[in-house]
């Protein structure tokens, strides 16, 4: 691969990693390059993003990982994008992700990924943007992954006074408690939506 192709791969990997970001160790392993090459590529990509005011993204280094982020100058437009009327329907993926966070909080994105069996970066971004979920600190240790919890807006949206009002699991010993969590959550969500429409 030439340098431009490597930069394209790096950009794709950073995009796919989302808020979790990538360490240089991960980049060297996935891209099969040296540590110095990874740092050089990151520096080049940083110059392209951070050195160009017309670009919408920047490359950040946080807690030993690198991630793409939107520029603060565009915050007003991003806010307009995510301001959604209360009757907006969440996707199935977002609802499943929200149910997992609600029942297991505080929880990392990787833990949510494990329960769902797929990456949940997109749904989590949507939930954060809608104010239903927020990050509340980071785990100790390598990677310092964000911990996600639900917000007071989540309680309001679902007609709950507190997390204690979440539907209890019918059978915690069931073979698939994760599916039970989601089914109960969807039932509660549908009930709250029906009440809003009446």
From Swiss-Prot:
InterPro entries with a match to the protein in the record: ScpB_csome_segregation, WH-like_DNA-bd_sf, WH_DNA-bd_sf
Annotated localization: Cytoplasm
Acidic residues biased stretches: 172-181
Record-level GO BP terms: cell division; chromosome separation; DNA replication
Cell division keyword on record: yes
Pfam family, one: SMC_ScpB
Span list, region Disordered: 167-198
Chief subcellular location: cytoplasm
Keywords: Cell cycle, Cell division, Chromosome partition, Cytoplasm
One Gene Ontology CC term in the entry: cytoplasm
Record flagged with keyword Metal-binding: no
PANTHER family with a match to the protein in the record: SEGREGATION AND CONDENSATION PROTEIN B
Subunit structure, interactors included: Homodimer. Homodimerization may be required to stabilize the binding of ScpA to the Smc head domains. Component of a cohesin-like complex composed of ScpA, ScpB and the Smc homodimer, in which ScpA and ScpB bind to the head domain of Smc. The presence of the three proteins is required for the association of the complex with DNA.
NCBIfam families: SMC-Scp complex subunit ScpB
Family that this chain belongs to: Belongs to the ScpB family.
Classification via HAMAP family: ScpB (MF_01804)
Function field: Participates in chromosomal partition during cell division. May act via the formation of a condensin-like complex containing Smc and ScpA that pull DNA away from mid-cell into both cell halves.
Protein name as catalogued: Segregation and condensation protein B
Gene: scpB
